[in-house]
C-alpha cells in the first residue's frame, strides 16, 4: 500500500506528481521533494484518480488554490441545484470542491457530485455520522464505518476534527461566539455527555490507516477556530493548533498526506502571526484557511472581508483559501453567491501570488494590460478572471455609446471618446515614434 507521500519519500515521481508539475510549470523533482517533506499535498483518492480526477497540488511552491463549499441543508435539498453550484464554481476557477451536505440522501448526493467533479473533492465525515441520529448515539464504530465508506466512494480529502480535546472546552467559555465549527460543536457535546476524550483523537491511528489505504488527504479541522474578531488568536485556538501539530506528524508517519485548517475571523494585524505560528507548530504542512474575515460587521459582503484577509494569509503562508460567499452568516448560498465567492477568493489568491513573486504569476496580468493598452477588447475580455461578467459589462457599455462592433470600439462609456486615455496614449505614441503597438515584450515585466 503506497500513497503520494510514501512514494515521494521513496524517491518515486508518480503520474499525479508529473501532472501537477506540468500544470504548474514546475519541475517534477520539486513536486516530489516538497511532497516528501510534507509541505505539499496532492489530494487524490485512488478511486477518484482512476476515474475523472485531474490531480492538483497544494503548497507554497505552487499557485494559491481556492476551494468552494457547496451542499444541501434540511431546508433546501436538491442534487441538481448543487451540481449547478459546483459547475458555476468550476467555471470561474475553483480548484477544489467540498460537499457539506446535511440534508437528504447524503450518499446519493456525494456519489452524484463526485461523478461530475474533475477536481479534488472533500467532505466532513462527522456530518454524516450525526445525520439522522442524536449526538449521544454516536459510537466509535459508526465513525470508522462512515469514514471508510466515504473513502471507498472516492473522496479526496476529509476534514477531521481530531484536535478538539476535552481539556480545551473550558477555554471557550469566555468567548463571544464560543464554538462556531459545526463539527467542533457536535464533538464538544459528545465529550461533555460521556465525559470522555474526543473519539477522533483516540482513534486517530485507526483513521490514518483507513485513509492511507485510499490515499485520502487529511484536512485537520480547526474545531475551535475563532468565529468573531474578539475571539481571534485566543488560548483555545492556539491550544488546538498545538494538538494539530502533533497529529500532523502522527498522520505523516503513517503515510498520510496532511494539510491543516485555520481561522476564521482574524483582524488584519494578527494574520501574519497566525500564518507563521501555524507553519512552525505544524511543521510546514499546507495551511487551509476560511477567509480569514477581517471584520464582523459586513453581512452580505463577507466575500470581500474574506478576500482582504485571504490575500494577506496567502502572502504570509497559507496555500489554500476556502471561499466565503456574500450570503455567509445569512443563509445557504445560491449559484450567483457561489460565483461571487469564488471570484473574490481567486482575486485574493492571485494578488498574493503576484506579491510573493511566484513564477509566472504576472504573465496573465501583462497580457491583459497589453491588450488594454492596444484597445484589444477581445483579448482584454478573454484574459480576465471572469470573462462572462467582463463581456456582459462591455456589451452594456457598447450599447450605451452606440458601438455596433463590440471589439473595435476605441473608447468606452467611462471616459467617452474625447477623454479616453488609452486612445489618447496611442495617438501620443504614434506622434513620438511612428505607429507602434505595445506587445508583451515592449518593456520588462516588474
Protein language model features and the residues they cover:
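Alpha/beta enzyme core
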Residues: 3-295, 301, 307-320, 402
